[in-house]
Amino acid sequence: MQTRFTASAPHSAAVTAVAAAVLVTALPAAAQPVPAPQVAARAWMLTDVTSGQVLGGANMDERIEPASLTKLMTAYLVFEAVRDGKLKYDQMITPTETVRSVKTDESRMFLEPGKPVSVRDLTQGLIVQSGNDAALVLAEAVGGTETNFVMLMNREAERLGMKNTHFMNAAGLPDPNHYSTARDLSILTASLIKNFPQDYKFYSQKDFTYNNIKQPNRNRLLWLDPTVDGGKTGHTKSAGYCLVTSANRPLPDVPGASRRLLSVIIGTKSDAVRTQESLKVLN
């Protein structure tokens, strides 16, 4: 079932105007907005990327800890470097001793210092396995140092219009000055999908094996909803369980037409809850 939610107050006038135009052409005349669902999350947002319409949300502009959702920006800059010829997916990178700084309780793809690895494998380790070690090595490959890479992250965030975001590292480790919002993460993900459609396909990959260690994609919706073709999970103790998900949904009563929905769920109590609440919002 496709449901359109009533947007929150700051954007209700603009959303109403856009919604009217969409309803005339895409939905039955009798269709009416329904109240937004109660979502068990600190913040959430649902956007129709196709039209740019905000369909609903709560606390969309509240500063939150993005955790591994940070890696959406890390991937964005890697995709940009590949597009611009600064990196190639078949290029081999040799991890330095800095990968030893990644702690054993952090998500890893299990890189080894001095053992060459391709940019493609690093990208899969970053996206599918959410490897903090992959984030660090890619940051150094693009920026020279992680410090320089973080400068690029913040510059890109400003360029994209992420008005309430500031990064301090490439992996999403907790820091008082490392923050974003549901709205900004929606802007980032929509831009990634639009600007790098081929690279975005990494996000639909259900598992990846590196160093003889197979790890599944942590986005459970890839198995539960056939219209979901990507997204990114995030979790720290302080951030809670977070999930950005995109689904390409057919438009009802419009043969051959579809729209892309993008949900952002921040700060739930468990992996199961973030999955459940994402499904609730998308449906």
Segment roles from a protein language model:
Residues 1-9:
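N-terminal secretory signal peptides that target proteins for export/translocation
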Residues 13-26:
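Bacterial N-terminal signal peptides
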Residues 162-166, 174-283:
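Domain-terminus/edge residues, biased toward the C-terminal soluble/receptor-binding domains
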